[in-house]
Amino acid sequence: MSNGSIADLSGRDLDHAVHAEVMGGNVGDPDVPLYSTDWTDVWRVLDQAEAWRIHKPPAGDVVVQVLIGGKQGKHPAPTVEEAVCKAVLKARHS
């Protein structure tokens, strides 16, 4: 895995960042089930992972692996944004 920087943020901050990115809207707004195309949130989330890897094949789903708090999350998805969100959520709640 490529090393990402380690940010000193609490799990709650990370969950909020992921939630905002997953919902594509404001934190706490569950009525916006769209994925954000704002890479700021994606990189903010990856900065909080101890390690991460993005594999983007020529065809097929992007695969993202993250390591957070010693827990690994891996998820394939059509977009990098979606794969990052789901991999992080998987690591946070595994």
Predicted regions located by residue number:
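Predominantly extracellular beta-rich ligand-binding scaffolds that present long acidic/polar faces
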Residues: 3
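N-terminal segment of the canonical double-stranded RNA-binding domain
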Residues: 6-77, 94
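A short, charged, amphipathic alpha-helix used as a generic interaction element across diverse proteins
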Residues: 79-88
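Short arginine-rich
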Residues: 88-94
